[in-house]
Amino acid sequence: MGQKVNPIGLRVGVIRDWESRWFAEKDYATLLHEDIKIREYINVRLKDSAVAKVEIERAANRVNVTIHTAKPGMVIGKGGTEVEALRKALNQLTGKRVHINILEVKRADLNAKLVGENIARQLENRVSFRRAQKQVIQRAMRAGAKGIKTQVSGRLGGADIARAESYSEGTVPLHTLRADIDYAAVEADTTYGKLGVKVWIYRGEVLPTKKKASEEGGK
């Protein structure tokens, strides 16, 4: 059976950048686990704040954390109280000085993680898996997606035998490296157990700007 590689990992270094940007020789494993802890803590603490991505940069004894969210107001809190409490908690967790930046995700319907969380939330509220998928597909296409594919797998509708059902619209060219494809895998906790939710969103092609610039210089 043909298996699919993670579309984000395949495009890192081609059209996507790393989400952790730092260099280490001896402490690599320690810092990697620290990154995982930071991301897990943020995702649990800001579960309802529509966090799309957490980027981490390091310099000496300082950690710069950039949180991409569709609800910046909830993350920052009244007068910045929430973000300050989060910063103190991360300082304690890492033992380093943590600086937090908040960036707003303008189009949540074109972000695979947020779309996946939307489907998962609906499944947890006993909405039909077919309806949940079709609804987010329509919204993504209206928001300007070139193509979208969703898949829900597990004990669908409480069935005894687990299965997977997927829906798609438009095109999702997984082999085209210049295609900007966002991907996410999310879990939904239902009364019948966990359901897996996968989302692929094709947002258009990313043109190789570096090559163009060099060509123009040559002319």
From Swiss-Prot:
Family affiliation: Belongs to the universal ribosomal protein uS3 family.
Q: Which domain of life is it from?
A: Bacteria
Q: How does it assemble?
A: Part of the 30S ribosomal subunit. Forms a tight complex with proteins S10 and S14.
Return the GO cellular component terms, semicolon-separated: cytosolic small ribosomal subunit
GO molecular function per UniProt: mRNA binding; rRNA binding; structural constituent of ribosome
Q: Give the gene that encodes this protein.
A: rpsC
Q: Domain named KH type-2: which ranges?
A: 38-106
Protein name, entry field: Small ribosomal subunit protein uS3
Q: Which UniProt keywords apply?
A: Ribonucleoprotein, Ribosomal protein, RNA-binding, rRNA-binding
Q: Which Pfam families match?
A: KH_2, Ribosomal_S3_C
Gene Ontology BP terms? translation
- Record function comment: Binds the lower part of the 30S subunit head. Binds mRNA in the 70S ribosome, positioning it for translation.
Checking InterPro entries in the record gives: KH_dom, KH_dom-like_a/b, KH_dom_type_2, KH_sf_prok-type, Ribosomal_S3_C_sf, Ribosomal_uS3_bac-typ, Ribosomal_uS3_C, Ribosomal_uS3_CS
